[in-house]
Amino acid sequence: MTDAPAERPDPSVAGDADWAAQARPLLVHADMRLRKRFDQGEPIERLVALRARAVDQLMRNAWTRCIPADSGLSLHAVGGYGRGELFPRSDVDVLVLGDSVAQQRHEQHLSRLFALLWDVGLPISHAVRSPTQCMVAAADQTVLTALIESRALVADAAARAALAAAIAPQRVWPPRDFFQAKREELLARHQRFGDTADNLEPDIKDGPGGLRDLQTLGCMALRAFGVKDVEALVGLGHVGCDEAAALRREREELARLRFGLHIVANRPEERLRFDYQKTLAERLGFADDLESLGVEKMMQRFYRSAALIRRISDRLLQRFEEQFDGEATPESLGGGFSLRRGYLAADSDSWPGDDVLQVFALFVHWAAHREVRGLHSLTARALAEVLREFPAYDVADATARELFMALLRGTRAVETLNRMARLGVLGQWIPAFASVSGRMQFDLFHVYTVDQHTLMVLRNIALFAAGRADERFSIAHEVWPRLRKPELLLLAGLFHDIAKGRGGDHSELGAVDTRAFCLAHRLSEGDTELVTWLVEQHLRMSVTAQKQDISDPEVIHRFATLVGTRERLDYLYLLTCADIAGTSPKLWNAWKDRLLADLYFAARRALREGVEHPPPREERLREARESARALMQAQGHDDATIDRQFAGMPDENFLRFRPEQLAWQAASLIEVEIAQTLVKARRAVPDNDALEVFVYSPDRDGLFAAIVATLDRKGYGIHRARVLDAPHDAIFDVFEVLPRDTYADGDPQRLAATLRQVLAGDLQQVRPARRAVPGQLRHFRFAPRVEFSESADGRRTRISLVAPDRPGLLADVAHVLRVQHLRVHDARIATFGERAEDQFQITDEHDRPLSESARQALRDALCACLDPV
């Protein structure tokens, strides 16, 4: 940088291009040196300071070249640059200070300066203001925030004093008002990110617990106490040495992530997007092992840093508030605790000492008083100081374990567990929970870290306990009152994923942990067995419902036999609903709700009638016809009409659908003659987006593929498809769909009309839409897997397809099946984040299972169509 010449100002721009051409490689070379030092592990605090210093020199040389010495103007770095920090792709924020006369006189000089800096490659963001204009602009606290961190680059003492006077607390934003504004800004910013840092692609600068939170604390400290950083508050008694050290350590951690992110993205990127996560993890030295991917280790460290920053920040914000508003008179709650300005505080300065029971007493009082705003900062710090000495449950005494179980049985148990988790107590009590805290899974299926997912599951259980009907969970409020001990479901929810990341089957490993915990807390053998079984089998109901044919009595028999009792079924159903809904906001839908409810009722009936003696096929057919007949009679249809419609429906239909579906199908068939096409659509559940589409048609080549392609083009995702052969060479197609894209309006009549129009034309002309793969999905590609087996009766071939999910996937598969002249009889569609796991039952065009050569040809065609490479 020192080689960039500092010439006398010249009103012409002659030579500026040469000057920029000399300066540009110097800046690039300086950045390359910093990158090398970054890779060698040099502290980020030094690297960002060195980059700011290099830019300082270039700025001063450019200023000297373009601005006359007697201009009356001064140059100041503001914002992050003002703090003396510049990350590789950060904006360079500057203020030119001068009165209006100087601004007008040197307007061309300033334009030349900024153009020159842009030519060099600096992303300059500038403001030109007089001191009075600075005072007016500082009415916006974001402007003031940038100005109070200013640093003179080319300025005399008078200019520095003028700027300081313009933004002095006596003129704009007194400290208390500034604190309130910054706190409101921080809370609003957190809300934009869902009030959590545990997102798949977190923002390490602006997200909760990010660098911006630390900068906000620094600005508050500067405005209120006149100190340059939070560490300086230690001497004033507002921050503990341990807190200051923790903030400094976590700031270095996040700053290293941000510095590396700017390098790998080669742009001012602040979000840890999937595009960069793996590359950044490798650059930072996080390696894969048998238990975790390197990227998962990196993200876990980030989430833990963000959580600790939030925890300490909450305490400091409260102390700043107390500094301005003063301490209120304590309101005694008894038991050694009081309310101070709405915050729960321990009365004793030595709390909790070495008494574990006092920590549990804190949470007991917190749960007992809904008016509590939170934990008092001094009590929170006292808790943090003794946290490392807080015992795990397996070495704690029996009284402490009894207190924990009492909290779990309390009316606000889930709130209490959330508080214990946020403050680090739950991870101390259950070390296995600490191990999964901040642990992410590098996929699109799990959108929360393991600990946050666990807490989401517990919140869903709390919703069931509220006793109010929730449209998302149609029967949960009916099942909940049957639970003998609700705390057992909470324990199962707490432990169901606790063994993630250890290698092996997390359900089996988690069951071992669960049993040890239950026995240590003196649960009965029966209760221990129930909770352990729930953890070990917590995926069973979800897998059965989504990957198997639950209209098949053999599937129901196997599932009911595994469950064994109505009590286990009730607990497992609620745990499954809470688990799926707590995995991703988009994962739970009306279709999954109905699917699990259907499995629950089918299993309950099997348990009631006895799993040893499942009803024979003829009995099931008779019951289904009788139930559907009763519904149609209630609608005014006579027996002759009902018999005629039933005769046109395949027997298999009565075994696959519920009575109300059968009645709807049969009533719809009244409108159509043999060899005609009928398309009907309706809402599968009232006041919900799920649609049921019924197509009755003469069997035609390409019918299934045309329907699937049309549904895809109209923005609907298919979750289940049933294709049955009906009398008179007709086909029964039933699809359960949900709007997938924003342009799918969810109108069943409009969708049915579109399908009628398509099916009235040439089906061979209907092709799948070509779609681009969304950016996120591109980072989770893998080779598709196609497996074949025979159906139980040997009449059909089963295909199990696992492939990277993408828009139009099923339409492409259906097109391949049509080209291969294959007939689809059943399809079950399941998507788990970036993975599509679909199953089909097919035959060749002569209704025979596929030969080995046909299987290989189909496998080759599907892989060629779906392979992401």
Swiss-Prot record:
InterPro entries: ACT-like_dom_sf, ACT_dom, HD/PDEase_dom, HD_domain, NT_sf, PII_UdlTrfase/GS_AdlTrfase, Polymerase_NTP_transf_dom, UTase/UR. GO terms for biological process: regulation of nitrogen utilization. The keyword Transferase applies. It comes from the Bacteria. GO terms for molecular function: [protein-PII] uridylyltransferase activity; phosphoric diester hydrolase activity. Its EC number is 2.7.7.59, 3.1.4.-. Residues 333-691 are annotated as: Uridylyl-removing. Pfam families: GlnD_UR_UTase, HD, NTP_transf_2. The keyword Repeat applies. Its cofactor is Mg(2+). HAMAP family: PII_uridylyl_transf. Has four distinct domains: an N-terminal nucleotidyltransferase (NT) domain responsible for UTase activity, a central HD domain that encodes UR activity, and two C-terminal ACT domains that seem to have a role in glutamine sensing. Modifies, by uridylylation and deuridylylation, the PII regulatory proteins (GlnB and homologs), in response to the nitrogen status of the cell that GlnD senses through the glutamine level. Under low glutamine levels, catalyzes the conversion of the PII proteins and UTP to PII-UMP and PPi, while under higher glutamine levels, GlnD hydrolyzes PII-UMP to PII and UMP (deuridylylation). Thus, controls uridylylation state and activity of the PII proteins, and plays an important role in the regulation of nitrogen assimilation and metabolism. NCBIfam families: PRK04374.1, UTase_glnD. This is Bifunctional uridylyltransferase/uridylyl-removing enzyme. It comes from Xanthomonas oryzae pv. oryzae (strain KACC10331 / KXO85).
